[in-house]
Amino acid sequence: MSIDKKEQRVFKNNGKRFEEDFKASFGNHIWAYRPPDSGGGMMARFTHESLCDLMAYNIKTKKLILLELKSTLGTSVSVRPYEQCMEYEKVKKEFEDWNAEQTAETRKPLKEKIKKKKKEIKELYKGTNSAMIKYHQIKDLLEVKKEYDIKTFIAFTFFKTTNTYAIEVDSFVENFWKITDKKSINEKDLDKLVENKQAYIIPQEYIRRTMKSKYDVDFLTE
């Protein structure tokens, strides 16, 4: 596929359009579904928040994938540093371990201290999810991959350059997030990952008649 960059238009609701166009781009042999903001069933085991933007199941290959879709009019997509997220996990675990050892009697005089600590942990959690790529999504999608061996992806589209990429979440973590001191990922980063065969370019085509984009995404389910 190719794209006519001069003809492509950007709308105020570009993020929603990207999600709709991406879903509609899968072939007829692929079931694609956009789950509601909070998942039920299997998804509820991992989070009360949105796990992903899109699920796709290929009836020929019998493969299911989960995708988190990120779009931007800027030049990069933000993510909180790995060290910050691990610090949250450390503080949370230390408190939970300590709290598990307490009894109703020992907790009584520590009521305010416990309340203050819970508030601190809540703020740390909010901080890890204050970027475009949220920590809880990375963590939960990694758990899905680990427990069910389901491929999970983050897809990025950059409207100004009309370039779109996809990277498996575990590759994003191991080949970028853990080893960078940056607070965002840009096209140069993604191009390098593609060059190293750690991410994918998503070919796309802009259809002027409908003002929609079509993405070549079937291969992600193969």
Residue spans of the language-model regions?
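Short, electropositive alpha-helical surface patch
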Residues: 164-189
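Short connector loops at helix/strand junctions that flank enzyme active sites
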Residues: 49-51, 62-66, 136, 147-149
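Acidic-basic catalytic patches of nuclease active cores, encompassing PD-(D/E)XK
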Residues: 1-50, 58-60, 222
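Charged phosphate-binding loop/patch that engages nucleotide di/tri-phosphates or the phosphate backbone
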Residues: 5, 191-222
